Amino acid sequence: MSDKKEDCFVIMPISDCEGYNQGHFSRVYEDIIKPSVFNADFNPVRGDEVSKTNLIQLDILNKLLEAPIAICDLSSRNPNVLFELGIRQAFDKPVVLIQEKG
């Protein structure tokens, strides 16, 4: 039996968004999401960390479909985030939805 953890794909903005301080989503990922995912015995993977080919869209699509679980941060209503969430839902894949309070 392998000790390799399964991936948890993290759907969230990977760059700064209007209305948020610079680096906000990087801090959320590094300080909140990653430790929580590790604690749940999964390996966190964000869209900018999946480069297997030269086509990042294909890499993200594969991870969206292959990851046994995903976390989606809806705080910014980012169009790419909502699109990726729609793909997970269209294929009936489990997703944990999170959003900042306020």
Segments predicted by a language model, with ranges:
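Conserved beta-strand segments of the P-loop GTPase G domain that flank and frequently precede/overlap
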Residues: I11, C72-D73, I98-Q99
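Cross-kingdom TIR/SEFIR domain
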Residues: S76-G102
